[in-house]
């Protein structure tokens, strides 16, 4: 693990405990089981969604991309602004915003799974009542 991961954990320690896990040649940063950032090649990318993405765009920041089958694929993780490395309060603000985006995504997926399960149960009930 590079020195960058412990640096990020220390930078965010006033906000929350942050763990790191290896993934795809980099690391994912997690809080309460949700990945809110990725570190690739000593660069930090934060989770973005429709709520916080405009702040990244306003600063001219770009999403993390990788090549797949000759095409660039963009993830919902955007480059962190440089000032977060000098200002712990900014680091916390951006990390919290990224974690909130991760939480919104997690809740939306959980709701979608619940709706799918309910539809499947309704189909099963309607088939068994015909029989």
Q: Which ranges hold each PLM region?
A:
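Charge-dense, helix-prone N-terminal extensions
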Residues: 1-131
